[in-house]
């Protein structure tokens, strides 16, 4: 991974980061297509995520709020890699789903953690009671949102409402939300709904198409590719 994919942000412009990187669990979708995610196992996963945290620091303003969805089984790695990049870990938030995810664990998973913290720098207190906080005083660590049923497009799609609930506390309209693992495009749609701007990166062309198609279906705006409009809903 190089800086080439972050050129659109220039030097330190992101106001908020919300991202859903590979979890390192070799996840396979439950649909007939058995969708997978690149770099979702072993050393590849660790190197990609660790480098992404460094790029997040490069592309963000000092003290930028960062949200990182991850697997509970990989929590130690995510926090250590986050702090190794110079970021400050604040706390873990929890997304509680409306249904369990069947797997091989003794207790079936019904939640996912989201790491919350800040990029290096920033003056004074960061978060509630200080800089980069636009929510009220009643925000809790638990967020209850239904798991998206349309997983035929992406195996780990996140609900738009979940992302909106978090970034609305950390970014103002017109601000830039950065997602280096674009995935299904939920971050882009959430930012659009809140009148924010978004910059996404996605390695897999298949999911790049999903991002553009979901955005077009949600907004009616036809994306542009190489300077020309491209209708992704007809593919």
Segments the model singles out, each with a brief description of its role:
Residues 1-8, 212-235:
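S-adenosyl-L-methionine
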Residues 1-208:
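Core catalytic lobe of class I
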């Amino acid at each position: 991974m190089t800086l080439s994919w972050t050129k659109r942000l220039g030097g330190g412009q992101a106001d908020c980061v919300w991202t859903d990187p590979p979890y390192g669990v070799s996840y396979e979708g439950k649909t007939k297509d058995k969708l997978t995610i690149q770099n979702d196992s072993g050393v590849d996963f660790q190197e990609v995520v660790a480098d992404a945290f460094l790029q997040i620091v490069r592309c963000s303003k000092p003290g930028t709020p960062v949200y990182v969805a991850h697997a509970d089984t990989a929590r130690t790695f995510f926090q250590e890699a986050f702090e190794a990049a110079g970021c400050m870990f604040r706390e873990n938030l929890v997304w509680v789903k409306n249904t369990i995810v069947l797997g091989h664990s003794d207790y079936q998973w019904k939640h996912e953690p989201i790491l919350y913290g800040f990029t290096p720098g920033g003056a004074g207190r960061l978060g509630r009671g200080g800089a980069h906080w636009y929510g009220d005083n009643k925000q809790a660590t638990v967020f209850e949102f239904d798991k998206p049923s349309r997983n035929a497009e992406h195996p780990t799609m996140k609900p738009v409402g979940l992302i909106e609930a978090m970034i609305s506390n950390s970014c103002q309209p017109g601000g830039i939300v950065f997602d280096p693992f674009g995935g299904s495009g939920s971050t882009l749609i959430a930012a659009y709904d809140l009148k924010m701007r978004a910059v996404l990166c996605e390695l897999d062309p298949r999911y790049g198409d999903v991002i553009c198609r979901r955005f077009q279906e949600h907004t009616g705006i036809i994306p542009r590719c190489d300077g020309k409009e491209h209708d992704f809903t007809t593919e």
